[in-house]
């Protein structure tokens, strides 16, 4: 099973990706995680990527395809994989097609923009552990302090409202074209994947079950 998982920033697709990975025993390939690891390394490339993300822009197609190509060649992808964060553009989709990557399903977790903005701007992070809180939906016991260590929580630099709105604008523009691209796939060597749209403004368990119900119809 080969899945592309779509969802705007804050839609909860990262959570769903982990659940799908465990349910179907397929590899979760998150370009976001791989990019964050590169940034954390402090390398020249990492610094360049940080500037791009802080501005609310997208990472280059060339870089994304390179890391995905390397990743899907690993043995744990033999049973299938879930692509999280790629493809985001038509050129990325075309490059995947050239690599012979056939996709079975496109699953989009859909949440209204106003709810996404509220979700993202309220996020607070404990840098050392990665623990995530929310000022409204999952507040720490003490405001702006990690529950376990008592250390200060931070807001990611790209979680401010202006940057979030820019990211959503880019996402919608790119995703609409991407879905049309796959719906109109004419490659003789590639089957047309099934497009599934899921309401993401529900409990995590309900979103997961809706996804499973659709995938199990195959």
UniProtKB/Swiss-Prot annotation:
What does the UniProt keyword field contain? ATP-binding, Cytoplasm, Kinase, Nucleotide biosynthesis, Nucleotide-binding, Transferase
Q: Where is this region: NMP?
A: 30-59
Where ATP binds, per the record, is at 10-15, 123, 132-133, 202
What are the recorded GO MF terms, alphabetically?
adenylate kinase activity; ATP binding
Q: Which InterPro entries match?
A: Adenyl_kin_sub, Adenylat/UMP-CMP_kin, Adenylate_kinase_lid-dom, P-loop_NTPase
Report the record's disulfide bonds: none
tRNA processing listed as a keyword: no
Q: What is its main location?
A: cytoplasm
The family classification in the record reads: Belongs to the adenylate kinase family.
User: What is the role of the protein in this entry?
Assistant: Catalyzes the reversible transfer of the terminal phosphate group between ATP and AMP. Plays an important role in cellular energy homeostasis and in adenine nucleotide metabolism.
Q: Assembly and interactions?
A: Monomer.
Protein name (database record): Adenylate kinase
What gene does this protein come from?
adk
């Amino acid at each position: 099973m080969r899945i592309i998982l779509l969802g705007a920033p804050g839609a909860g697709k990262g959570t769903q990706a982990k659940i799908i990975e465990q349910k179907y025993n397929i590899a979760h390939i998150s370009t976001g995680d791989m990019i964050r690891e590169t940034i954390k390394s402090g390398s020249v490339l990492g610094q360049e990527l940080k500037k791009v993300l802080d501005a609310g822009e997208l990472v280059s197609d060339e870089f994304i395809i390179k890391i995905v190509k390397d990743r899907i060649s690993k043995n744990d992808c033999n049973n299938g994989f879930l692509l999280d964060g790629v493809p985001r553009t038509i050129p990325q989709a075309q490059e995947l097609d050239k690599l012979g990557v056939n996709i079975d399903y496109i699953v989009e977790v859909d949440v209204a923009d106003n709810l996404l903005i509220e979700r993202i701007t309220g996020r607070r992070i404990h840098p050392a552990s990665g623990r995530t809180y929310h000022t409204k939906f999952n507040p720490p016991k003490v405001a702006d302090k990690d529950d376990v260590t008592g250390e200060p929580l931070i807001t990611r630099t790209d979680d401010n409202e202006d940057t979030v709105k820019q990211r959503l604008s880019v996402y919608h523009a790119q995703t609409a074209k991407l879905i049309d691209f796959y719906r109109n796939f004419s490659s003789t060597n590639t089957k047309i994947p099934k497009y599934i749209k899921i309401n993401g403004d529900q409990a995590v368990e309900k979103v997961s079950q809706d996804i499973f119900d659709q995938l199990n119809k195959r």
